[in-house]
């Protein structure tokens, strides 16, 4: 069985929490796109784990984790992430972590380029809100054929790799010295860096596509873990305020290394309210006062898992969520952080947008979204703790009414609801997985 877990909104929906739960019954968890530019947070007891590159299934000892073809991997960051988990007693070996030989390496200069360009753009206020982790530059060089893939580290003693390294270095030094006046990198330094990464990761690098095909043939349960959400997809998001990869479920099998493999289920994860990190149009933040947003941000601890940046927040946006649901083609919906709203006497929901005098019910990321205003309905809050609820019937009537209002606006049932950060603080209804 092949199941994708994806984000319906801007990311930070709680995918890591859902993956961690589903991984209890899974054999393999695969990250299929992105890099270390976002984080998935998993809470186990008193321990909180923030995973930027490693799949959320790494916390389960019987699960094999895969970094797939579609990723760009900062190996220095991966080393630190592995060491941090090992320091907490989490075993990581070539048996439970496999790196695709087709995945792209995020080279040291990609971070440098990202930082320099974002700093340049900030001078006139045109920055994109990059995480400055080199993701766009790693993907750019992938498509320009001016970078390495992980499998190349296994062939550093062969002449064709040396030729490619020289070609890459010459091109990159021209860019960095010509555009940004940086000191050029030497070939010995580049080769030494590659050799160090090969020594650290050669045992982990393999044909993960073949591994996954065999697993599916043996009827293993495979989870595909997306990074970010539909609004950050390079094609279907709010361009240019997107990530540099495809965040949608349809890309999952391709980025995992098993193109053509059919998805059994797609879980779309959304939050009980709206959040966004980074620049770009975000209509939901126009709906309420600054004090309301500050209270919500504190209640939900809405700060970026990868960057620590305060998230932009607003009410649940049904217009954006319908579009994200359509992009992901989800047949299951997980609603997270419902408990964060428990203190509110009244809860706003965005039902449509207003563009001058025109009512907008359909989300169009190619339109001018800066002049949209949110239209809200108010539903009564429940003002009581729900973190102990383990069945839908245990929820207060107004909490059920809030969920059912969202279901009606989305035209889709919600099957999973989290009522706290702990592993056991959730409930299901209808046909879950």
Region roles according to the model:
Residues 1-433:
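Non-transmembrane, aqueous-exposed alpha-helical and coiled segments at domain scale
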């Amino acid at each position: 069985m092949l199941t994708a877990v994806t984000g319906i909104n801007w990311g930070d929906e709680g995918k890591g929490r859902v993956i961690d739960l589903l991984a209890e019954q899974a054999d393999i968890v695969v990250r299929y796109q992105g890099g270390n530019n976002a984080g998935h947070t998993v809470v186990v007891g008193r321990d909180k784990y923030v995973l930027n590159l490693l799949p959320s299934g790494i916390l389960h000892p019987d699960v094999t984790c895969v970094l797939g073809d579609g990723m760009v991997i900062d190996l220095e960051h991966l080393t630190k992430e592995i060491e941090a988990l090992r320091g907490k007693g989490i075993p990581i070996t070539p048996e439970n972590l496999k790196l695709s030989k087709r995945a792209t390496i995020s080279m040291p200069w990609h971070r440098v380029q990202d930082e320099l360009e974002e700093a340049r753009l900030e001078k006139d206020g045109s920055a994109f809100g990059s995480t400055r982790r080199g993701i766009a530059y790693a993907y750019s060089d992938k498509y320009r054929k001016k970078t390495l893939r992980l499998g190349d580290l296994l062939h550093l003693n062969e002449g064709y790799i040396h030729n490619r390294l020289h070609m890459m270095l010459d091109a990159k030094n021209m860019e960095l010295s010509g555009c940004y006046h940086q000191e050029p990198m030497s070939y010995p330094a580049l080769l030494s860096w590659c050799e160090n990464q090969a020594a650290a990761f050669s045992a982990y690098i393999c044909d993960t596509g073949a591994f996954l095909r065999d697993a599916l043939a043996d009827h293993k349960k495979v989870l595909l873990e997306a990074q970010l959400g539909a609004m950050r997809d390079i094609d279907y998001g709010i361009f240019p305020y997107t990530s540099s990869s495809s965040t949608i479920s349809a890309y999952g099998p391709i980025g995992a290394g098993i193109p053509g493999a059919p998805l059994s289920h797609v879980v779309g994860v959304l939050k009980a309210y709206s959040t966004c990190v980074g620049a770009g149009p975000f209509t939901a933040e126009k709906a309420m006062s600054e004090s309301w947003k500050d209270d919500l941000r504190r209640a939900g601890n809405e700060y970026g898992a990868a960057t620590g940046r305060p998230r932009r927040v607003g009410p649940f946006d049904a217009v954006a969520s319908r579009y994200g649901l359509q992009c992901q083609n989800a047949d299951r919906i997980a609603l997270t952080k419902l408990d964060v709203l428990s203190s509110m006497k009244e809860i706003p929901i965005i039902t449509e947008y207003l563009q001058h005098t025109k009512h907008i019910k359909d989300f169009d990321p190619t339109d001018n979204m800066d002049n949209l205003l949110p239209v809200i309905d108010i539903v009564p809050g429940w003002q009581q703790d729900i973190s102990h609820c383990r069945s839908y019937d245990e929820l207060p009537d107004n909490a059920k009414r809030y969920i059912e209002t969202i279901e009606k606006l989305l035209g889709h049932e919600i099957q999973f609801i989290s009522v706290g950060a702990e592993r056991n603080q959730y409930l299901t209804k209808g046909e879950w997985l």
